[in-house]
């Protein structure tokens, strides 16, 4: 177990506030960081920390153990990534457990629509609640669907996707029109000057749509990936790289400016990990296939195949 706040400030509060404590959320980001660090450096020290943490979570949560998911999804996609990278299927199985627990309120109080906990994910058809929570949950859902080849997760995924794309997405790719819940309201409620459009939500759109592409090979989701990379995400960062938007409204009376930092600085740190990873979205491989997913000046080498793109 690793959570500096709980361990140093409230050591008796482990797993006590699943709705708002963000323990599994933070664990998921640690796992993602560990995989990225090992890929970049070949060093496995942080990966071993993440593996031990995942083993602790697997010992505490699951059938016959704790059944409650985290109020802020993230652990789901991270466990699949850790499972793929380490070759340990039990982590992906734990991710599937957390996905299926969303909306199942056996022995606990529901987190409600805000955390997409109002209905089992396999029964959901509409995008609701907190935008970033939704993107991370459905990214994990797509990962689980791809890992286990589970079409029953892909069908609701695309029902939710259509509702989002057709009725609740701005022309910039921004999502989440309301600051009140940092998320969604009703269909076509897309005001310009009060648009919330959190930077992290656009990054979440990138993550989810890229995963839907990897799971299905569909090109329409790549249009969304491209829109987020060119529009939804960059607006959150000043050209000098030293000031940030948390929300990205489409209109301003001059009173909305980028700032150096926030009390809750998820957006700057999310940008810091996203921009260096753009290369991973350009190409993909499948059985006897090589996909060019984005038109970008790039080069790819894979075994006997070399591609050069000057777009």
Model segments located where?
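Glycan-recognition and catalytic cores of secretory/periplasmic carbohydrate-active enzymes
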Residues: 1-309
């Amino acid at each position: 177990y690793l959570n500096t706040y709980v361990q140093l400030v409230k050591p008796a509060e482990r797993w006590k506030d699943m709705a708002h404590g963000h323990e599994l959320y933070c664990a998921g980001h640690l796992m993602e960081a560990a995989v990225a660090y090992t890929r970049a450096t070949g060093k496995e020290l942080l990966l071993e920390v993440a593996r031990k943490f995942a083993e602790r979570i697997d010992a505490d949560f699951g059938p016959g153990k704790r059944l409650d998911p985290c109020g802020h999804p993230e652990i789901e996609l991270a466990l699949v990534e850790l499972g793929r990278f380490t070759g340990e299927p039990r982590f992906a199985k734990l991710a599937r457990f957390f996905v299926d627990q969303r909306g199942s309120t056996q022995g606990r109080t529901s987190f409600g629509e805000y955390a997409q906990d109002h209905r089992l994910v396999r029964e959901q058809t509409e995008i609701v609640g907190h935008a970033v929570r939704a993107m991370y949950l459905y990214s994990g859902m797509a990962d689980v669907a791809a890992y286990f080849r589970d079409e029953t997760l892909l069908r609701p995924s695309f029902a939710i996707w259509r509702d989002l794309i057709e009725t609740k997405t701005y022309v910039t790719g921004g999502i989440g029109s309301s600051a009140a819940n940092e998320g969604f309201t009703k269909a076509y409620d897309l005001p310009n000057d009060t648009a919330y459009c959190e930077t992290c939500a656009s990054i979440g759109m990138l993550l989810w749509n890229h995963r839907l592409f990897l799971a299905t090979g569909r090109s329409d989701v790549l249009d969304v990936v491209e829109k987020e990379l060119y529009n939804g995400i960059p607006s959150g960062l000043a050209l000098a790289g030293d000031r940030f938007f948390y929300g990205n409204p489409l209109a301003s009376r001059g009173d909305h400016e980028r700032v150096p930092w926030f009390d809750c600085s998820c957006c700057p740190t999310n940008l810091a990990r996203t921009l260096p990873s753009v290369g991973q979205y350009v190409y993909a491989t499948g059985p006897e296939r090589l996909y060019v997913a984005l038109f970008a000046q790039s080069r790819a080498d894979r075994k006997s195949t070399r591609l050069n793109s000057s777009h």
